């Protein structure tokens, strides 16, 4: 039986026509002399009816059918009477009266129902991922993923970009997270690494004169996982010669504008908002701020410079800062127990505690109210735009501790008290990142993005004297508090790249050992170039309104980097280890 139509495509215009369908049985209802089947394929669901008036043989076959049996049916499209119309189905105005039914395959009892909403535990869904992916909302998410990838490819192709593949087996270099290593059978004791990104190769393609490159590429990072991270992920990788930062930002905005219009019918406002790294941290406590709601961090170091409260005073004397957060109407929203729990909430961010005050008609109340005189209270309330019923929170410590603690608290309040417009898409460029930051544990500077990021021209002289003050010609694209990706202008002169490696603690010998091939390439007329890499999985997650990346990756890993479906990673045979000249040793405690 050859399929003539898809289930979700049938409507009243086909009434009276014979159709042949194939799909899975979503639901079966046996009324004795009539059996109703909800037949599902990728396009949707249609009701098919098996009755003795149309076909005794089809009714007998339908009697053997159960949920998720795969069947082929042939029948006539019939318009339902008005009382029988199902408004919940796109095909609810019609049904198919079956003349012939063939069971193509059977199904065991299901571990969970194939429905849009499921209460199945995630580990069960991942173990039976092939069933989970049958659910309509999962099918829709992957249809959107395809649409996004096609939109990106079409846009970049029209703009003159070439899609060029780069190696999956490459050299391990010290440029970021831990590598996934692949042992070489031919070269005993040596290893390939799976790429964390095609960064070096795409720069070499610019040296090669391709000028405009892109790739939708798989990347691998052996790092701790969270809701928006996976060990293998896909990024939209773009590199171009002779374009400056403004050109790259404009190109990316145009691509996202096309993408949102095609997937959601939205017209984006361009140019996107911009904010420097310093401004983002000061206002939102984050380098990827969610700008769908206000509640900005308030600078209080000057207002409270004469404070006698030891915690505040000590922070200022140690070169730290004081910032505040106003929760409007919070006095009635949070109990003392709730407030105490917030002190525990901020501790993982380095905060030693969380000072707070309630505002009422008489002024301020709380454990630290006694440390404020009348003038200080007035100045504080004015600075924090506070009124009766508000709850005020304070962070006093090193800059980064205050930023991270209050930034996280701000997001927590935004979600808990429904301050965020969940239907909005707020794009934001964050620019002027520090080129490097000092790693206290490693006792050296590390690149904030990667070692190939170009310093701002006006800051070049600071690289040797005050490297922590050097800004990068780098930019991140943020959507609703998630970093979609980032990019930069790249270093393309050997001398400057060697200076960058030296700043990061590489000796001349180590730099040559790890990156000699790139340094040599820079001796052959390398053009100015820059680019951007955007996380495809994260884009799909946000546009499909999913809560984590596992919902938009067909076969994802768990939080422990395991695949519950295939049971990877797994042990390999002794013979395989011998081929690779490897042996397993226990890690020393």
UniProtKB/Swiss-Prot annotation:
Keywords: Aminoacyl-tRNA synthetase, ATP-binding, Cytoplasm, Ligase, Nucleotide-binding, Protein biosynthesis
Record function comment: Catalyzes the attachment of L-aspartate to tRNA(Asp) in a two-step reaction: L-aspartate is first activated by ATP to form Asp-AMP and then transferred to the acceptor end of tRNA(Asp).
Residues that, per the record, bind L-aspartate: 175, 221, 449, 490
GO molecular function: aspartate-tRNA ligase activity; ATP binding; catalytic activity, acting on a protein; nucleic acid binding; transferase activity
Superkingdom of origin organism: Bacteria
UniProt cross-references to Pfam families, sorted A to Z: GAD, tRNA-synt_2, tRNA_anti-codon
Family note: Belongs to the class-II aminoacyl-tRNA synthetase family. Type 1 subfamily.
SUPFAM superfamilies: Class II aaRS and biotin synthetases (SSF55681), GAD domain-like (SSF55261), Nucleic acid-binding proteins (SSF50249)
UniProt xrefs under PANTHER family: ASPARTATE--TRNA LIGASE, MITOCHONDRIAL, ASPARTYL/LYSYL-TRNA SYNTHETASE
Organism: Shouchella clausii (strain KSM-K16) (Alkalihalobacillus clausii)
Source taxonomy: Bacteria, Bacillati, Bacillota, Bacilli, Bacillales
Binding site for ATP: 221-223, 230, 483, 535-538
Compartments (UniProt record): Cytoplasm
Record-given protein name: Aspartate--tRNA ligase
EC identifiers of the protein: 6.1.1.12
PROSITE patterns in UniProt: AA_TRNA_LIGASE_II
Subunit-structure text: Homodimer.
Listed GO biological process terms: aspartyl-tRNA aminoacylation
Chain segments carrying region Aspartate: 199-202
Substrates-to-products reaction catalysed: tRNA(Asp) + L-aspartate + ATP = L-aspartyl-tRNA(Asp) + AMP + diphosphate
Major localisation: cytoplasm
């Amino acid at each position: 039986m050859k399929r003539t139509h898809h289930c979700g495509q049938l409507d009243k215009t086909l009434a009276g026509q014979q159709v042949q369908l194939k799909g899975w049985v979503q639901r079966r209802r046996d009324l004795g002399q009539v059996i109703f089947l909800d037949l599902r394929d990728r396009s949707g669901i249609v009701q098919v009816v098996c009755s003795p008036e149309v076909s005794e043989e089809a009714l007998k076959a339908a009697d053997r059918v159960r949920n998720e049996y795969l069947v082929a049916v042939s029948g006539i499209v019939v318009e339902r009477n008005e009382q029988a119309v199902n408004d919940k189905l796109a095909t609810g105005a019609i049904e198919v009266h079956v003349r012939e039914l063939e069971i193509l395959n059977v199904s065991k009892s299901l571990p969970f129902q194939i429905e849009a909403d499921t209460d199945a535990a995630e580990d069960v869904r991942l173990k039976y991922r092939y069933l989970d992916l049958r659910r309509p909302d999962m099918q829709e998410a992957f249809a959107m993923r395809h649409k996004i990838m096609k939109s990106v490819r079409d846009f970049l192709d029209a703009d003159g970009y070439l899609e060029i593949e780069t190696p999956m087996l490459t050299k391990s270099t010290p440029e970021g997270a831990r590598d996934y290593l692949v042992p070489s059978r031919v070269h005993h004791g040596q290893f390939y690494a799976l790429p964390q990104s095609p960064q070096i190769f795409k720069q070499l393609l610019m040296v090669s004169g391709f000028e405009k490159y892109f790739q939708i590429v798989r990347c691998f990072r052996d790092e701790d996982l969270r809701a928006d991270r996976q060990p293998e992920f896909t990024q939209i990788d773009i590199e171009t010669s002779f374009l400056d930062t403004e050109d790259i930002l404009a190109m990316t905005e145009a691509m996202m504008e096309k993408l949102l219009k095609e997937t959601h019918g939205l017209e984006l406002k361009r140019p996107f908002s911009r904010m420097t790294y310093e401004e983002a941290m000061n206002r939102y406590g984050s380098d990827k701020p969610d700008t769908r709601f206000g509640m900005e961090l308030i600078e209080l170091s000057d207002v409270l410079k004469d404070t006698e409260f030891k915690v505040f005073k000590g922070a200022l004397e140690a070169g730290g800062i004081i910032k505040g957060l106003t929760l409007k109407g919070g006095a009635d929203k949070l109990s003392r127990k709730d407030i105490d729990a917030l002190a525990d909430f901020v501790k993982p961010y380095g905060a030693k505690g969380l000072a707070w005050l309630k505002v009422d008609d008489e002024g301020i109340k709380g454990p630290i109210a006694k440390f404020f005189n009348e003038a200080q209270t007035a100045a504080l309330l004015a600075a924090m735009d506070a009124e009766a019923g508000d709850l005020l929170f304070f962070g006093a410590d090193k800059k980064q501790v205050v930023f991270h603690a209050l930034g996280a608290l701000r997001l927590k309040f935004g979600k808990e008290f429904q301050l965020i417009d969940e239907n909005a898409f707020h794009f934001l460029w964050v620019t002027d990142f520090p080129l490097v930051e000092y790693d206290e544990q490693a006792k050296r500077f590390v690149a904030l993005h990667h070692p190939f990021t170009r310093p701002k021209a006006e800051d070049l002289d600071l690289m040797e004297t005050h490297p922590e003050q050097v800004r990068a010609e780098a930019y991140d694209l943020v959507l609703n508090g998630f970093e979609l990706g980032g990019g930069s202008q790249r270093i393309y002169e050997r001398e400057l790249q060697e200076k960058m490696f030296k700043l990061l603690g590489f000796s001349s010998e180590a730099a040559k050992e790890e990156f000699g091939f790139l340094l040599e390439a820079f001796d052959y007329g390398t053009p100015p170039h820059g680019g951007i890499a955007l996380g495809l999985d994260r884009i799909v997650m946000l546009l499909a309104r999913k809560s984590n990346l596992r919902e938009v990756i067909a076969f994802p890993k768990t939080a422990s980097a395991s695949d519950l479906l295939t049971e990877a990673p797994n042990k390999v045979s002794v013979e395989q280890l011998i081929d690779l000249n490897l042996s397993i040793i226990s890690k020393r405690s």
